[in-house]
Amino acid sequence: MKYRTHKCNELSLDHVGEHVRLSGWVHRYRNHGGVVFIDLRDRFGITQIVCRQEENPELHQLMDQVRSEWVLCVEGLVCARLEGMENPNLVTGSIEVEVSSLEVLSRAQNLPFSISDEHINVNEELRLTYRYLDMRRGDILDRLMCRHKVMLACRQYLDEQGFTEVVTPILGKSTPEGARDYLVPSRIYPGNFYALPQSPQLFKQILMVGGLDRYFQIATCFRDEDLRADRQPEFTQIDMEMSFGGPEDLFPVVEELVTRLFAVKGIELKAPFLRMTYQEAKDSYGTDKPDLRFGLRLKNCCEYARKFTFSIFLDQLAHGGTVKGFCVPGGADMSRKQLDIYTDFVKRYGSMGLVWIKKQDGGVSSNVAKFASEDVFQEMFEAFEAKDQDILLLIAAPEAVANQALDHLRRLIAKERQLYDSTQYNFVWITDFPLFAKEEGELCPEHHPFTAPLDEDISLLDSDPFAVRSSSYDLVLNGYEIASGSQRIHNPDLQNKIFALLKLSQESVKEKFGFFIDALSFGTPPHLGIALGLDRIMMVLTGAETIREVIAFPKTQKAGDLMMSAPSEILPIQLKELGLKL
């Protein structure tokens, strides 16, 4: 049986007089007395079909029984709609199909939510439980189609650049990479476990040892971590690695790749992208993921804070803290109530409060006005280049607390005051991250233990490891990290030294990374790589609020699959076969 001669978006006035066959879902149904109208929908569009009782009573009776989301196959004659009855909102709005035969291919039970009315808000848990129905509402399928085109563009470009797509193993060895592993018990080796990959990191580096030169993969990765709006337990990244190069070789490749991906949506980007060191980003924006669509740059105010008699300023400065903030143009219109709300907001991030200083009619209005002279306030206005009716917002706190609080406050105010264009795309490379972070007083990798230190900082590894910068880089878009990578360590002695600084014993290194150290010992080319978060890129490209909206079958924020009721218990016999007990 031939189910269709045309898709539901293809018919026009050029087809008037033709007999056609269409298949699809009942999108909307209307019975106007002796005339039944049905909007028939497939993935491509909608066509109106019609049956008149006086012309075909039996068919009219059958169509009168049809309900929403039934699947039909219809045959009929393409006719022009009557003048004034055209629908300009449909590609096929100038025609309709007068049905001569109809077959019900599948019936649908009562729907848990409306498919035809996309504007009705539906509880997300209900949508995820019936994901297949949610897909029919339009946005999800559109995003999946966009994702498909983005992946095609990715493969085509990287192939042009000499990258080879290689699929690396899903079942691998558990190695410390930051987050918890998802573990898979082995039936063949009782008591032993595979780990699902948090990334193909070691495999892609070993491919460079093997001489592949340039590798890529659209890889599925797994991390058992707490979820946020932009995280999933399983996610997809565009994974890349290349030999005999440095960041100056990689950056143009990635910039052109991103440009091609955005071109899928008709968005034109300008390269090269801005670059900023980690320290510059922290100093000016309070974060290593700055949103550069708006100003509100942070400024260190310690020089002026020392001239205050305000105890909170002086106490923070005496104990190594900082005083910093930003200027909001025209912000002097903020009410005391609004400023109290902002004060409560920054307290969530550990700040003791919020200092505000308004420049109004050449004078000063501030909640710390009595703690400094007029001259000090004027010096601060000059430093911030504040104009009349601007406001300065300051925080006195330890550096990390001040940065975090001001970063969030800056974003909140920019959103509330509409200081940026949501269709603007501001990319920035963040470079020169610290090689190590501090966790409970101990060294831990800022990115991962395979990141190379900058050559000029290697001498500091023994004397001042926290001062060592890494040859690593993140690509940030509008406050989202969409890619992260680094130059890799290709010297086994240096790699062992990094492991030792991380207090991994020789036995532990041999057990977890022995195969990798062996590989590095057989002639390893200098190499580097990067991974782009495909889900996050799609989230930005399609305007989705969460990455769940750009994944066909996402997990909830509690890592559950509501449609399949996973995770679920398994049978005792399955546990026994695996040699496990609960």
From Swiss-Prot:
The lineage of its organism: Bacteria, Pseudomonadati, Chlamydiota, Chlamydiia, Chlamydiales. The gene is aspS. Keywords: Aminoacyl-tRNA synthetase, ATP-binding, Cytoplasm, Ligase, Nucleotide-binding, Protein biosynthesis. InterPro entries: Aa-tRNA-synt_II, aa-tRNA-synth_II, aa-tRNA-synth_II/BPL/LPL, Asp-tRNA-ligase_1, Asp-tRNA-ligase_1_N, Asp/Asn-tRNA-synth_IIb, AspRS_core, GAD-like_sf. Signal peptide: none annotated. Homodimer. This is Aspartate--tRNA(Asp/Asn) ligase. ATP binds at residues 223-225, 232, 481, 533-536. Aspartyl-tRNA synthetase with relaxed tRNA specificity since it is able to aspartylate not only its cognate tRNA(Asp) but also tRNA(Asn). Reaction proceeds in two steps: L-aspartate is first activated by ATP to form Asp-AMP and then transferred to the acceptor end of tRNA(Asp/Asn). CDD domains: AspRS_core, EcAspRS_like_N. Its main location: cytoplasm. The keyword Acyltransferase does not apply. It catalyses: tRNA(Asx) + L-aspartate + ATP = L-aspartyl-tRNA(Asx) + AMP + diphosphate.
